[in-house]
UniProtKB/Swiss-Prot annotation:
GO molecular function, a single term: ATP binding
SUPFAM superfamilies linked to this entry: GatB/YqeY motif (SSF89095), Glutamine synthetase/guanido kinase (SSF55931)
Coiled-coil residue windows: none
Domain of life of the native organism: Bacteria
UniProt source species: Legionella pneumophila subsp. pneumophila (strain Philadelphia 1 / ATCC 33152 / DSM 7513)
Signal peptide location: none
Protein name as catalogued: Aspartyl/glutamyl-tRNA(Asn/Gln) amidotransferase subunit B
Taxonomic lineage: Bacteria, Pseudomonadati, Pseudomonadota, Gammaproteobacteria, Legionellales
Amino acid sequence: MEWDTVIGLEVHAQLKTKSKLFSGASTAFGATPNSQTSFIDAGLPGVLPVLNEQAIIMAIQFGLAIHGTINDLSVFERKNYFYPDLPKGYQISQYQKPIVTNGYLNIQLGNNLEKTVHIARAHLEEDAGKSLHDAHTDYTGIDLNRAGTPLLEIVTTPCLYSAEEAINYLKTLHQLVRFLGICDGNMQEGSFRCDVNLSIKPKGSSVLGTRTELKNLNSFRFIEKAIAFEQARHQDILESGLSVIQETRLYNPDNNTTQAMRGKENENDYRYFPDPDLLPIHIDKEQVEEIKNNLPDLPEAISKELKNTPSLNDEDINFILSSPDTYQYYKKIKSLCPAADKTIINWLKGQYAAFLNEHNLTFETPPISAKTMAAFLSKIHEKKISSSIAKNIFSMLCTGEKDIDAIIEREGYQQQNDNSALEEIVEQIIKQYPEQVTEYKAGKEKLLAFFIGQAMKQTKGKANPEQINLLLKKHLG
């Protein structure tokens, strides 16, 4: 029997606010356990939450970026459940009146296909704390540093039908929140994590099957493997004549299986009701318009613009959009340098990216400023240095040198453009290699590169290769 897989995703993106959603405690990652915990985070009686305005602004930014509806009235509600790292006994979230509804995100699939993923809602809620199972041998510790950190929960409709579609959507969303500057996207630190709701149904059927939820996946590779395992598990159960149980499961990467965690709750189990300590949020159109006018450049628009640059291919564009810092670095160089787009991107994704990877650096803190890199590429564009000399200069720039003209003067890297001197070198090479000259004239034109190489060798890389090329063709006939 053939089956269709149906997937809906819930992504929790930690917002990059300096303080928590309802308290002034810091959101910085990696602090000593419980050192960034306020009375509100600890759930002590008599304390009242105060809403972080910046979190509201970030949620609106996201809603605009996904072409969603920004609701003028939004309400915080209490989601009631017990868990050791939730000291209040409830989570402040949004249910009936979220900030954002009815958005979409376009994703790219293979063979130049595009799919629109419908986003049902995006709402604000506070994160829970952490259970520390490895810190002590005889009991579990609780760290409330994360408790109260603002989350934007982004929920799709069940409109994804394969692991490939799910991963492409998640990567596109991950890219978007980073370019918006609302989330750092650090999956290892839990800043961007995903719950997968999955079911299967007979092929072509309009009736959805019983779903299971896979919780807190924080790696694209693990998400893909978890979906594949859960698809196969559902299929085995149904083809054995049994029924899938609606439950929450955890993925175990050590043995590539999912394990039951608890029965899957319905909304009624959480007994949502408006939080009496928080007033409804009224968002006026003028505020939304102001936020819209200040949105940064976003990946979809940048990609369309870059695709109008004939010299850039998909690989080049993907590199430029690999992070906001990479894009900003490329954009700054473009504004300062007359070099061709292809020249810029070849240096950035080639020798520069290799150096960054080798030294565990990124374009967030580049060893060469965009201004210096633009000046360097301008020298290449103006043919003041050859490509072989450029590599030597680049290595020096990576070690902290900044004055390119001083390097050229000190090392004697001035390019030789004297036509008569270069012509003399070409004549010497032709006399030195008569056998190769004969072969070239007989039709072995690839030998031209050999002659150019000899000229560059004799001039220690200082000759203008284009001039050498023209002179060789002139003398070889």
